[in-house]
């Protein structure tokens, strides 16, 4: 399928949110988090999100993953296709929920484990950063020493990604190349030669698109997002036009008020000022009181 959107939430959840393909999710996580064979994620348990309704505002339903790294590390993956200015605040909010929900009432803080938020973005977000992958922790602003390793927030900006060498590709780069949609099937097949998980992902994609029900659901979701973009664009244009008109009106009124004040100071009668400025008699009388 041409222009297939691999960030479509229905497809993304089928690919990385299904325990039948948890080996792919492990590959994605271990790659993004730069885990080697000695400390990699070995198993994952998916949170039950089957009943979560799809939103039509471009904020794709969250794919929540609970990853078991033998120490209980929690991981949350979120896909965002529509530009969202408060992405940092949103990510921090969901990170805090993930972190706090580890403890039951009365439990000890020492039971808290590391929580990692991964944001996969289809738009440029961090204006001051050139790299496609940026990681944030809690640091001392003077010494840059880390306060704790319990918080880790990742931003993966797909538009910034460029594959430099197909022959020396890391697992993280292979996955971002796949999700970015920038590379052809032939190029992905070449990538799959060094990253078997991508080969399996491409094969699943073909199976997904051959399923009429799945494909129809995918197309309906894509249409909903396109409609959202169209509506927001129309509302924005209407809002700008309305704002411009309101601004012009407000500016003219301020200018007329200043003119009226100057005329009052010169002793011009109220009727003449009304005719000259368009302000009401009540407005002029109020200005007379104000300047006395």
Task: Identify what each model region corresponds to.
Residues 2, 75-80, 177-292:
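Short, charged alpha-helical interaction segments and adjacent helix-coil junctions
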């Amino acid at each position: 399928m041409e222009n297939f959107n691999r960030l479509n939430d229905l497809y993304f959840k089928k690919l990385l949110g299904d325990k039948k393909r948890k080996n792919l999710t492990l590959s994605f996580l271990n790659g993004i988090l730069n885990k080697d064979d000695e400390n990699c994620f070995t198993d994952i348990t998916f949170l039950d999100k089957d009943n979560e309704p799809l939103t039509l505002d471009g904020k794709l339903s969250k794919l929540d993953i609970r990853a078991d790294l033998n120490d209980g590390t929690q991981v949350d993956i979120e896909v965002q296709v529509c530009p969202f200015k408060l992405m940092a605040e949103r990510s921090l909010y969901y990170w805090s929920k993930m972190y706090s929900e580890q403890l039951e009432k009365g439990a000890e803080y020492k039971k808290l484990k590391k929580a990692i938020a991964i944001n996969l973005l289809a738009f440029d977000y961090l204006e001051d950063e050139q790299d496609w992958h940026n990681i944030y922790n809690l640091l001392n602003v003077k010494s840059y020493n880390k306060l704790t390793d319990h918080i880790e927030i990742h931003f993966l900006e797909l538009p910034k990604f460029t594959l430099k060498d197909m022959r020396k590709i890391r697992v993280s780069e292979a996955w971002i190349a796949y999700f970015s949609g920038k590379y052809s099937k032939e190029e992905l097949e070449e990538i799959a030669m060094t990253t078997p998980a991508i080969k399996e992902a491409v094969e699943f994609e073909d199976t997904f698109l051959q399923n009429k029900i799945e494909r129809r659901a995918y197309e309906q979701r894509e249409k909903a997002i396109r409609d959202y973009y169209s509506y927001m664009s129309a509302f924005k244009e209407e809002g700008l036009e309305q704002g411009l008109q309101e601004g012009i009106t407000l500016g003219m009124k301020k200018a007329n008020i200043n003119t009226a004040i100057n005329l009052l100071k010169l002793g011009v009668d109220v009727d003449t000022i009304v005719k000259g400025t368009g302000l009401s008699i009540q407005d002029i009388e109020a200005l007379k009181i104000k300047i006395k």
